[in-house]
A protein has these predicted regions:
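Intracellular juxtamembrane helix-capping segments at the cytosolic ends
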Residues: 109-123, 329-344
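Conserved MFS/SLC helix-loop-helix module at the cytosolic interface between two early adjacent transmembrane helices
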Residues: 55-94
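Extracytoplasmic gate region of multi-pass secondary transporters
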Residues: 24-25, 211-256
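Cytoplasmic helix-loop-helix junction between adjacent transmembrane helices
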Residues: 99-137
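A late C-terminal transmembrane helix in Major Facilitator Superfamily
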Residues: 340-377
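Helix-to-loop junctions at the C-terminal end of transmembrane segments
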Residues: 56-68, 265-278, 303-304, 374
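C-terminal ends and interior cores of transmembrane alpha-helices
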Residues: 78-91, 288-310
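Helix-loop-helix hairpin linking two adjacent transmembrane segments in secondary transporters
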Residues: 93-95, 134-187
């Protein structure tokens, strides 16, 4: 297996799915504007995406090694390419739900395959963490690009126009190119060494990993982190539009700062973690997240007389709040890497299945809860609520670290 070509292939997959997955914030805003749906209804898009990820991961994670990671990647890419090309033709909110369900289904295949391939390409914990952060950093570069790609298709003079749906023709073409590249890259199929135990047994094997207290605290931490990230990230464009009073296209463009900060943070984390212990590093990030929200939200009281015609006219809070992404950045890939690097490669698909499931559940609940609070009490209250899970993450990681130090050998038991 050519290591560099394989890294390029999985990075390309992650890039195109980054654009699609994290467009949900933009699509929520545009669905409210174009299809005249409520914030609560719009928040269900996250559920169609994330619950599809959870459902598919729950039932196929342990089977992907059998069909091969290359086949799984190609299947996911082709599925989404087809649905993207159909979306502008239907141009209805119900089909947007279908689109995100397809995106979630495909990403379950892609993420499990990518994480498992990272394990094959890494020889130790340091190389695993470094490659994980690099790939996740490229993912965030895709997210950053997505905001500008989508904003380029929005008519600032008529935000309710359906013209923005034409972006899916471009994305369908990009995904097709990615699928062709992955198909021709020589990715070796890892020999399946497990016993032929059947579907139910393999499914239960994955669930048995959660019996270990260390793994249980890990998945709780993942759930809470994604709850915060998706709650803020998915609703930041709407926050910019309705709380800060920015135009639709500028609201979306400024959200790219959030993605840029996460991309920068994840790329830098690979270097900084060579010198700083992971637990100290994560807690420092969580404290800075807490302070950013606490100090920035009072600044979002913007005068109604303020007129914004460009990104440089936006109030200071529009730049400071997305900066929280810099401190969020390393947390998700780092805690994933800590667990995955301690497991044998044959268990990576099962553990990644749990990661995907709890990430999806956290994202769904976070976006829905934020949408409901936003609808009933306003955007400021919705974002203040994220302080609670941030504190909960600190406690869960404290227990996780203690269990890791005392019973690290627990992770290597077969499941």
């Amino acid at each position: 297996m050519n290591r560099m070509l394989t890294i390029i292939a999985i990075s390309l997959c992650y890039f195109v799915f980054a654009v699609l997955l994290n467009s949900v914030g933009t699509v929520i805003l545009q669905s409210i504007t174009t299809f005249d749906v409520s914030k609560t209804d719009a928040s269900t898009l996250e559920g169609f995406k994330d619950l599809s990820i959870a459902f598919v991961s729950f039932f196929i994670a342990s089977f992907i090694p059998r069909i091969g990671y290359q086949v799984a990647l190609c299947l996911g890419l082709v599925l989404v390419a087809v649905v993207c090309l159909l979306t502008p033709m239907f141009a209805e909110f119900y089909f947007i739900k279908v689109l995100f369900a397809a995106i979630g289904t495909a990403f379950a295949l892609v993420k499990i395959s990518v994480y498992s391939l990272i394990g094959q390409l890494s020889s130790n914990t340091k190389t695993h963490s470094s490659l994980m952060n690099t790939v996740e950093g490229i993912f965030m570069v895709g997210v950053l690009s997505g905001y500008w790609i989508f904003s380029g298709f929005i008519d600032p003079n008529d935000p309710a126009s359906l013209a923005w749906l034409n972006v899916y023709y471009l994305l369908g073409g990009m995904i097709t190119i990615a699928a062709i590249f992955v198909y021709f890259v020589p990715i070796e199929r890892e020999p399946f060494t497990g016993a032929q135990t059947g579907a139910l047994s393999e499914f239960l094997d994955m669930l048995k990993l959660t019996y270990q207290p260390l793994v249980l605290m890990f998945v709780i931490s993942v759930f809470l982190y994604v709850l915060v990230e998706q709650g803020i990230g998915s609703w930041l464009p709407t926050f910019n539009r309705e709380v800060l009073g920015l135009p639709v296209d500028i609201s979306i463009q400024l959200t790219s700062i959030f993605a840029a900060m996460i991309a920068i943070g994840r790329l830098l984390a690979g270097f900084l973690l060579r010198f700083v212990p992971w637990y100290i590093f994560i807690n420092g990030c969580l404290v800075m997240m807490f302070l950013t929200i606490l100090l920035t939200l009072p600044m979002t009281q913007v005068s109604e007389s303020q007129v914004v015609t460009g990104i440089f006219d936006a109030p200071l809070a529009a730049y400071l709040l997305p900066a929280i992404g810099l401190f969020m950045a390393p947390i998700y890939p780092l805690i994933n890497s800590v667990v995955l690097s301690a497991l044998p490669n044959k268990q990576h698909a099962k553990m990644t299945g749990l990661i995907v499931i709890f990430s999806a559940l956290g994202g769904t609940f976070g976006s829905f809860l934020t949408g409901v609070i936003f609808d009933k009490f306003g955007g400021q209250h919705a974002f203040y609520m994220s302080l609670i899970p941030i504190v909960m993450i600190m406690f869960s990681l404290f227990i996780f670290k203690k269990l890791s130090a005392n019973r690290r050998s627990t992770l290597v038991k077969g499941a």
